[in-house]
Amino acid sequence: VVEAGAWWTLLVAPGLLFALAVLAVAGDAVLDARNAGRQVGLAAAVRPFLGVPRALVAQPRRLPASDRLLWRAGVVTVPVAAVLSTLVIPFGNRVVADLSVGVVWFNAMEVLTWGGLWLAGWGPNSAFPLVGGYRFLAQGLAYELPLMFALISAATGAESLRVGDIAAAQHGLWYAVWMPVAFAVYLAGVLAFSFLGPFAYPVGRDLAGGVLGETSGVDRLLLQAGRWLWLASGAAMAVPLFLGGGAGPGLPAWAWSLVKTLLVLGLLVWVLRRLPVIRADRYVELAWVVLIPLTIVQALVPALVNLNR
């Protein structure tokens, strides 16, 4: 049974999310070093963090006619939305807020990132960031519907939008096993709303960094942190939605939640280094022709099962 946590969970949840994001960045750096033929070790793992002190003291870039307020609001929204999404993610038997509409809350925070990233592209009053922001909107329109149907599949199976109820409903069989399409689409959606790996089109090199192109200092650090915080949050949410939450033999519930989250996070980091960047127009075609019909059929499966009970 998942219970709403005490006040201290408000501190633990963001701290744990940050730790998972740091592990993901370190793991990605190690894979990058191996692919580049450099020495793999502690030095490779900490390399991305060496520039953090310099970024903290760097002067923000100022552009003519930029809307500094919208720019800063967009930059801050991305990591803040990622942290807020963790309020409904149970860790073991504890959750910060056991909302009856937890799935909706998580999805709403993810959609909030759309607005944040678009503002981060609009605010600088520069062509490349603006195009990057619009690229994310196009990408979002493609991945959001399949992602929503994947979330609906899990919620329909449990007949509840409460994340704890969805985890508890998998006591006999994980949803990842009998809803494999929903699970795979959800993982792709995590990479998409993190705009990492194959979905890094909004920050592509052909746009000189796109949304990230004009950011510097703390602003750039916040946007980059937001990407990895969302990856960690998405990996953690996969556990109660599709992998039975903290259920498992031998270990306490929190330990199983941690193990499963680390495995999903490791898989996502490995995938984002394996796949090339997908152009938004190609992903739109794939989503509307293939993914949306598949996820609709997948969502019908638990609905029919519940009707026949």
Please report, for each region that a protein language model flagged, where it lies by residue.
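Alpha-helical transmembrane segments of multi-pass membrane proteins predominantly involved
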Residues: 1-309
